[in-house]
Amino acid sequence: MVITFLLLGIPHGALDVYIEGGLDHQNDHRKIFLRYVLTAALYICLWYWEPGIALLVFILITAFHFGEIDWIGNTNDQAKKVVYFFLGLCWILLLLSRHVETALGVFESITRNQINQERFLVWGKLFYPLSLITMLLLYGFLFYNKEKYFSWTQYWYIAAFQQVILLILAHTTPLWIFFAFYFGIWHSVLSLDKIRLHFKLSSSLQDWLFLLKKAMPFSAMAWIGILYFIFLTVKSTDPTGMLSLIFIGLAVLTIPHLQVFTKLNK
């Protein structure tokens, strides 16, 4: 899991400053970076004082972000954004409810035991079939509206095939392995490809390495911050606690990342 985060997960977010400021040095990256840090700092404060609310915010913004990255349809109006937000939300709820006991341990650690265990387990059993059925209904809706939602109708079949692969993996792997695959590989590669297209770079190895090289300074800073946060607050022998703090670290970086990255889909 750490390897996928290190090689792809963090670097795709580390390019945010270049999305706003450009790959060259004509724009002041320091101002962009300062705004990024201040936004993250405000969210850290929310995690400290209201971890339950911060967790809810994280789930909602992650649903939107995962949905927009996986989405291969049109993005020319709000209706499309609503569809891929709910697809992303269904994915998160399905994944958490499928692995409800593991998720409970992580959420208890994140929220400092503010989670009602019995209620969480009951809701988890409810959300699993609900999220799966909603996802199937959404794809059924998209099937009958392929011309409206996709620039090429065959994209629906590609999107459906991708979802089948992810569903199989979600049902056959532990939560942390699927999370490592989805965030560290699937989501990150798709995100990096969108960034590559944004900067009109080719798909050559040279241009891919160029992107990763650009990401290295801010990747190092992000990893130092996350690791420092982890080692200050949890013992290395506590895997649930470690995973919880990784989630918080990623959550803190997600809000400013979403603010920047959504511009690619406008």
Where are the model-predicted features located?
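Transmembrane helix interruption/hinge and helix-loop junction motifs
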Residues: 1, 45-55, 170-179
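C-terminal ends of transmembrane helices
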Residues: 13-22, 63-76, 137-151, 195-196, ...
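A cytosolic-side transmembrane-helix exit/cap motif
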Residues: 20-27, 73-87, 198-210, 262-266
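Cytoplasmic-side transmembrane-helix entry/capping segments in multi-pass membrane proteins
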Residues: 25-34, 56, 77-89, 152-160
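Hydrophobic, membrane-inserted alpha-helices
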Residues: 35-45, 66-68, 159-169
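Long hydrophobic alpha-helical segments that form multi-pass transmembrane helix bundles
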Residues: 79-148
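Predominantly late transmembrane helices and immediately cytosolic-facing juxtamembrane segments
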Residues: 182-199
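Extracellular/periplasmic helix-loop-helix junctions in multi-pass membrane proteins
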Residues: 228-248
